[in-house]
Amino acid sequence: MRISDRGYGEEGRERLTLVPENVDDLWHLAHVLEPGDLVEGDTTRRIQRNDDQMRDTGGQREHLFVTLQVDEVEFARFANRLRVSGVIVGCSREDQLNAHHTINVEEHDEITVEKHFKPDQTERLEEATEAAENPDVAIATVEEGAAYVHTVQQYGTEEYASFTKPTGKGDYSRPREELFAELGEALAHLDADAVILAGPGFTKQDALDYITEEYRDLADRITTVDTSAAGDRGVHEVLKRGAVDEVQKETRISKEATLIDDLTAEIAQGAKATYGPEDVAEAAEFGAIETLLVVDDRLRTERQGEGDWSIDVNEVIESVEQQGGDVVVFSSEFAPGEQLSNLGGIAAILRYRLQ
């Protein structure tokens, strides 16, 4: 994320001109923008001339500069765009005021956001800005007969490629080198800045030997990690062990994987942890929260007034921060966020055990 300008609007609202530089940045914006915010940007709108009246039911598209009062925000993950919908409150054509419209924000599009930013939203934007300096990382996991490649995003990991077929002896088996060749070709095509090669046993080392010999450009980018499995389970082990941090300093998802493991361990011991909105709010009142964990999509729903929590989540967050606790907003796109959702969407690691 690049912040190209800062200022202030009416009623003390902060104005930030932002340029999302990748799909991660669009995802961050989806969790920063809320109903009532103002978003300015270039767009196109279908205009039809009909007795000198303008409407958007047909005709040619015209370029406009609009300010929307936001009603709804949607991160279209597979289209690599952010859809910001709302009412036009400012426009280069006055006849379009008060009409409903949607701005499609894509990578490298510039928009200006005017709103009262909450502390966790400011932190999210700062995180996105700092992450622009991190290298792209791929995790390749391999075991006998199977190999997988995952890309590491800030909102989670995504499977980029998978190759499964028995290797070794048998009528339907194939030479291991064929599997390693497919893996090497996928990694070369992905062209990540760093590759973590993981898996159980000696298969991982054999794959490394093959790839460094046949794909020499990849050799200096690969580090290896021992895991008990390949695929999603192996990826989780890589993240939990902090292997991604070694090449990317710190990533959101490796931090989340460690925190959710710490939380579930404390819960299993009946120790310093609590979960669910009411219990977490009570812990915040006692000043007992060391780290507050909340899922991004649930946080957004509650802030929009569409949730069913009986607590004010903003008050809980402010209370935790005022008492020196940390607040971590989990991605719902990744396994730790799913685990946290199953615990009610909000939980806390405590400074001390509550009776």
UniProtKB/Swiss-Prot annotation:
This is Protein pelota homolog. It is found in: Cytoplasm. It is an enzyme of class 3 (hydrolase). One of its GO terms (cellular component) is cytoplasm. Monomer. GO terms for biological process: nonfunctional rRNA decay; nuclear-transcribed mRNA catabolic process, no-go decay; nuclear-transcribed mRNA catabolic process, non-stop decay; ribosome disassembly; RNA surveillance. Its EC number is 3.1.-.-. The gene is pelA. SUPFAM superfamilies: Dom34/Pelota N-terminal domain-like (SSF159065), L30e-like (SSF55315), Translational machinery components (SSF53137). Its cofactor is a divalent metal cation. The N-terminal domain has the RNA-binding Sm fold. It harbors the endoribonuclease activity. Keywords: Cytoplasm, Endonuclease, Hydrolase, Metal-binding, Nuclease. One of its GO terms (molecular function) is endonuclease activity. The keyword Metal-binding applies. The keyword Membrane does not apply.
